[in-house]
Swiss-Prot record:
Name the UniProt record assigns to this protein: Protein transport protein SEC31
Membrane topology category: Peripheral membrane protein
Compartment list: Cytoplasmic vesicle, COPII-coated vesicle membrane; Endoplasmic reticulum membrane
Subunit structure: The COPII coat is composed of at least 5 proteins: the SEC23/24 complex, the SEC13/31 complex, and the protein SAR1. SEC13 and SEC31 make a 2:2 tetramer that forms the edge element of the COPII outer coat. The tetramer self-assembles in multiple copies to form the complete polyhedral cage. Interacts (via WD 8) with SEC13.
Lineage: Eukaryota, Fungi, Dikarya, Ascomycota, Saccharomycotina
Gene Ontology terms for molecular function: structural molecule activity
Biased composition (Pro residues): 751-763, 851-863, 871-888, 927-941, 968-981, 1026-1050
Comp. bias intervals (Polar residues): 792-806
Metal-binding keyword on record: no
Length: 1184
């Protein structure tokens, strides 16, 4: 699996200390700009950065210029120094200290070779010793104890040896060196003795030599010749001939690397642009990694992390990838899968047959999420895997579970402090809260009727008086100018007169008098009255003395209204520093979740310390404090119905922590309840929920026994089908997988006139939306004779075959019964979908959850299978109906049965929804209405035709058998019992139909020919007895029968009444016209067409067919926009989707596409497939 790419044409070396890689411009190449510059660069490989930007490394950590280009590069620790050494085309040895590289002046350059240095190798037994090999057979041994003063010693020169292409020190025996040369000679040296020990020779150039990691006499040489691209395995105990040959490359091999931790892995690459993985022990090629566009000249495993290796090619890339591919291997992909893998088409396609030695588990047990433990025991080569429950410190969550159920009474049973009293008051309602705040409950007193005169009316002034019109106030009153009169009263400080006058004046005058009053009064009462009267209670909150906090809170509760929560929280903020308990009361009464949770969350650590003083373990103390916090929060939310307000990220983190702890104890249901409280946008919550949902699924079995494999895990190969642990729930659409259950038959409806058989074609339906069940009509075909073969009437929109309860289940024309190996009901004659059982235990090669491809459609099984739609076997065979057999019905138009049970590439059932009467078919429920056979719907994967060709056609099942001539079964005469049916072999679904004279074998993949087939054979085969009809209503009288029967042995064809012509379509603009797109839809067309034009050049040629098809379908969408056919909601969603593509926000674009397809399937036509492919291609390419 590709992890990183470096855009450099360079040789490279892995760092022995950390995940870094050094690159040096390779010799013998020319850049696109014909530059002769050379760079030495060091790159940080951050495997945690999985972004699209992080995939391609563009910024080296260190970059310096070099005087010459490199043939080879090594990075090695000598003990005191970390050295990078380069073999250059100028013949000089360049040495850098990796930790001190600043520029080219920091290198030490030594020239001893007379020509270019081709290869370098450090001695694993002597870290300061380096050997270099070059042209003309020159080999030098270097002492790098002091990197600034390298000391060289010539090992030997053999002019016949040619250029030294590769060096390798023996991994076991000290001082043993192997050198390979361009003339095919591989020489074994004793470096200390400067002595040649032996040679192995090949008649072709040898490009690379490697020693076996653990066997001192074994080595491999690679041949660079295109005519014989092989790797030879030698054992020096007999060097006369190679011990084995590894063949697989089509051109010369340039580089080989033998894994030091597991000798069963060997990498090779060469001129055929390929990188192969081998098992040298079995001489088997394990697989091929993604091919480059040019020669791959070096491949090397990382010594610290052998799962990783890098390959350099003349394509201009260094690719860093893993040994094991986790993207599904070479499994055949469906059309929809191609685009998901478009961006990874050149990645590895290898599934290792054995686990690397460094991954073989040294233990035999493993803990699993959700309080599970897996134990493995191996006896006599057989491994037994057991999955059980494991609980460490049992946590008590009963009280929280009770609260979540809504029962708060138990939470207040114990005396737990002042906060719990407040919570209890909140849980009991308003009266209890008023009582807690010492606010008396005002009871309404019954009104007392008093007919006596108003006592105050007797207190009115009486007697004669003078108006004193000269008084300005009196004059203003007389003239009705009350505002002026009030102003004069206020000016003379006559507040009582002003209040009396304001009663008859406007509200503005009243406010003026009140303000004047409050301005002159300084008492607390006046301040309080002002706050209440002007609704400025924040003045009381901010300025009143905190010793009266409870009275302030009561005032706020009485007059605060909608602002009470905010005002009470503000009062709590004032109290928090000086009086934590009273502040908590204010927060609780305010109902502010953020304030309450923030206060309690800050006290968790303090509570932990208190618990640890009582010799409680730190983890137990932490969980106890966390549990108290969660319990109080849960009670608070239930008591006040508090909603998330403000910033409650701290609370969400505590919810998640608590959920993880209880999930680890196996209480997955409680954990799910708390994760459900987190918003979907909260970071990481989606992954947590997915993990919980998977863990909560019931396992099929807790014990699995199988042969032990090389992975240390069971080898699953049993052909015995496993029972599925999942039973689909019946829905309004019925279930095509639900077992057939006998049900009481409903009385049959009266038959309408025979013209009901002519069903007008229905418009084509969306192939990607689940099909609703077919409507039930009142028409029932004529009843069959008890002795006649059972008719298998089929409705294209209701594919489940129906059975006549009055027809015998076995006869000479019966097809062989089929049996679904999974015990689910599938129509007879249809393909049975089988899938490999899913294993409950994970192994090395198991794919990640997000990488598992959707289930593929299996091919129909040609072997004899028995039908799962056969009626249940009765306890005793049924007796034939009383009376003579009735003649077979004639002139019946039926359609053949349609196989059901497959799914298309988008996960929806093929063939429509199952019949809602499937369970009643064997017990006499009426068969569905015969339907006119119509042309099949368009193939969702075929290229779209031009809009002018898209005539609306009725939708039928694309896998329906080809209709043919009706062949009448032989008549059964009265008193003559039909011969016993013989079990016949099932018809080959791929064979051509036989001639007329025998019931034609149906081909489920043949296109309709326009005729009508006779009734297929019943599902129950010969030898099987149908169950007796149980408490069923007699069938209704059928439509009038045609008195003319077809001649014996000949086909009977029935004319089909033509369907009424569809209404004329509204005038549309011509296809391809884009001038009438409304302004609201114009941005959709502009954005999609522009982005599509930019994306197309980046899609590989192999997908050209899909590109053309997608483009045609997109043009259909543009035609709809041009005709203003789209609904406003659809236009809005398409606008969002196009903007997401333009902004490269592909997850949002994919989510919007899925939302459109599922929420409005009726509005989605053929263009939706093109839009889906557009989004998938864009997400795969990502940048253009």
């Amino acid at each position: 699996m590709k992890l990183k790419e470096i855009d450099r044409t360079a040789t490279f070396a892995w760092s022995p200390n950390n995940l870094r890689i050094a690159t040096g411009t390779v010799a013998g190449t020319v850049d696109a700009d014909f530059s002769s510059s050379s760079q030495l660069e060091i790159w940080d490989v951050d495997l945690m950065d999985r972004s699209s930007e992080g995939f391609r490394l563009t910024k080296p950590a260190v970059s310096i210029s070099a005087d010459t280009r490199f043939h080879d590069l090594v990075w090695h620790n000598t003990g005191k120094h970390s050295l990078i050494v380069g073999a250059t085309e100028s013949g000089s040895l360049e040495v850098w200290e990796a930790d001190n590289i600043k520029d080219s002046s920091t290198s030490v350059s030594v020239k001893e070779h007379s020509g270019p240095i081709k290869t370098l190798q450090f001695d694993p037994h002597n870290p300061t010793r380096l050997v270099s090999g070059g042209t003309k057979g020159e080999i030098f041994v270097w002492d790098l104890s002091d990197p600034k003063k390298p000391i060289a010693k010539k090992l030997g020169t053999d002019n016949k040896a040619g250029d030294i292409e590769s060096l390798a020190f023996n991994n076991i025996t000290r001082n043993i060196l192997a050198t390979s040369s361009s003339n095919g000679i591989t020489t074994i040296w004793n470096v200390d003795q400067n002595k040649e020990l032996t040679r192995v020779k090949h008649d072709k150039p040898v490009s690379h030599v490697v020693w076996h990691p653990s066997k001192p006499t074994k080595l491999i040489t690679a041949v660079a010749d295109d005519a014989e691209p092989v790797m030879l395995i030698w054992d020096l105990k007999n060097a006369n001939a190679p011990e084995g040959v590894l063949q697989g490359h089509s051109k010369g091999i340039l580089s080989v690397d033998w894994c030091q931790l597991d000798p069963r892995f060997l990498l090779s690459c060469g001129k055929d642009n390929r990188t192969l993985l081998w098992n040298p022990d079995t001489h088997e090629c394990l697989g091929e990694y993604g091919a480059a566009q040019n020669w791959t000249f070096k491949t090397k495993l990382n010594e610290r992390t052998p799962d990783l290796f890098a390959t350099a090619s003349f394509e201009g890339k260094i690719v860093i990838q893993t040994l094991q591919d986790v993207n599904g291997g070479d499994a055949p992909a469906q059309e929809g899968d191609f685009f998901q893998n478009l961006g990874t088409q050149s990645q590895a396609k290898i599934s290792l047959k054995q686990a690397p030695s460094w991954l073989q588990r040294p233990v035999s047990n493993s803990f699993g999420f959700g309080g599970k433990i897996v134990t493995v025991t191996t006896t006599d080569g057989k491994s037994t895997v057991q999955v059980g429950k494991f609980v460490g410190d049992k946590v008590d969550t009963e009280s929280i579970e009770v609260v979540l159920k809504g029962d708060l009474t138990s939470a207040f049973d114990e005396v737990k402090g002042a906060e719990w009293k407040v919570l209890e008051a909140l849980s009991k309602g308003t009266d209890e809260v008023r009582s807690f705040l010492d606010i008396p409950v005002m009871k309404e007193e019954p009104a007392v009727e008093d007919d006596s005169e108003d006592v105050f009316s007797k207190m009115s002034p009486s007697g004669a008086f003078s108006l004193e019109s000269s008084d300005p106030i009196n004059q203003a009153i007389i003239n009705g100018n009350l505002s002026t009169a009030v102003d004069l009263c206020l000016k003379e400080d006559r507040l009582l007169d002003a209040f009396a006058l304001a009663e008859k004046a406007s509200d503005a005058v009243k406010t003026k008098v009140q303000n004047a009053y409050f301005a002159k009064q300084t008492s607390s009462t006046a301040r309080l009255l002002n706050a209440v009267n002007t609704n400025k209670l924040d003045d009381v909150v901010e300025n009143a003395n905190l010793k009266d906090w409870k009275e302030i809170l009561a005032l706020l509760y009485t007059y605060g209204g909608a602002q009470f929560g905010d005002l009470a929280a503000a009062l709590g903020d004032r109290l928090r520093e000086s009086d934590r308990d009273n502040a908590a009361t204010c927060y609780l009464v305010s109902g502010k979740l953020d304030k309450v949770s923030g206060l309690w969350e800050s006290e968790i650590t303090t509570r932990e310390k208190e618990l640890t003083k009582d010799n409680v373990a730190p983890y137990t103390a932490h969980f106890s404090a966390l549990k108290e916090f969660i319990e109080k929060i849960s009670v608070f939310r239930k008591a006040t119905n508090a909603v998330d307000s403000g910033t409650v990220d701290g609370l969400y983190n505590k919810y998640r922590e608590f959920a993880n702890i209880v999930a680890s104890q196996g209480n997955l249901e409680l954990a799910q309840q708390f994760l459900a409280l987190l918003p979907a946008s909260f970071e990481g919550v989606g992954l947590e929920r997915e993990r919980l949902n998977k863990a909560a699924k019931p396992s099929v079995a807790t014990t699995a026994t199988s042969k032990a494999s090389a992975y240390g895990k069971p080898s699953y190969g049993s052909a015995t089908p496993q029972a599925s642990a999942y039973t689909p729930t019946a829905s309004a659409y019925g279930s095509m997988y639900a077992p057939a259950v006998p049900a009481a038959a409903a009385p049959a409806a009266a038959a309408p006139p025979p013209t009901a058989a002519a069903v007008p074609p229905s418009p084509a339906k969306n192939m990607y939306a689940p099909q609703p069940p077919a409507p039930v009509t009142g028409f029932a075909p004529a009843a069959q004779s008890p002795g006649a073969p059972q008719q298998n009437t089929h409705n294209p929109y209701n594919p489940t075959p129906q059975t006549n309860a009055y027809a015998p289940q076995g006869n000479a024309y019966s097809a062989a019964p089929q049996q679904n190996t999974y015990g689910r009901s599938t129509p007879g004659g249809g393909p049975v979908r089988t899938t490999a059982p899913r294993h409950d235990t994970a192994g090395y090669n198991d794919l990640p959850a997000g990488s598992v491809p959707p289930p593929k459609k299996s091919a129909p099984s040609p072997g004899p299978i028995s039908s799962a739609y056969a009626p249940p076997t009765p306890a005793a065979p049924s007796a034939p109906p009383a009376g003579g057999p009735r003649p077979p019905s004639v002139n019946r138009v039926t359609s053949p049965g349609v196989p059901s049970g497959g799914v298309n590439a988008y996960g929806f059932p093929i063939g429509g929804a199952p019949s809602p009467y499937g369970a009643q078919a064997a017990y006499g429920a009426r068969p569905p209405v015969p339907a006119v056979v119509s042309p099949p719907p368009p193939n969702p994967y075929a290229p779209a035709h031009s809009p002018a060709q898209n005539n609306v056609q009725p939708a039928v099942n694309p896998y329906a058998p080809a209709p043919g001539a009706v062949v009448s079964p032989p008549p059964v005469h009265a008193g003559i019992v039909p011969p016993p049916a013989q079990r016949s072999a099932p018809s080959n679904p791929y064979a051509p139909a036989p001639g007329a004279g025998a019931p034609p074998a149906s081909n489920p993949y043949a296109p309709p020919t326009g005729g009508f087939t006779g009734a297929p054979a019943p599902h129950a085969g010969g030898g099987y007895t149908a169950p007796p009809p149980a408490q069923v209503a007699p069938p209704p009288a059928g439509p009038p029968r045609n008195s003319v029967a077809p001649p014996p042995g000949g086909p009977a064809r029935n004319p089909v009444p033509s369907s009424p012509a569809p209404p004329p379509a509204a005038a549309k603009h011509p296809a391809g016209d884009r001038t009438h797109i409304p302004a609201t839809s114009r941005p959709i067309f502009d954005t999609l067409s522009t982005q599509w034009a930019g994306l197309k050049p980046h899609i590989p040629e192999q997908y050209s067919k899909h590109v053309r098809d997608a483009e045609k379908r997109l043009n259909i969408l543009y035609d709809h926009l041009n005709n203003d056919d789209a609904q406003p909601e659809m236009v809005e969603d398409l606008l969002k989707l196009s903007n997401a593509i333009a902004q490269r926000d592909f997850p949002t674009a994919q989510a919007l596409q899925l939302q459109i397809a599922t929420a409005r399937p009726d509005e989605c036509g053929k263009w939706m497939v093109g839009l889906k492919r557009f989004v998938e291609m864009a997400a795969a390419v990502r940048t253009w």
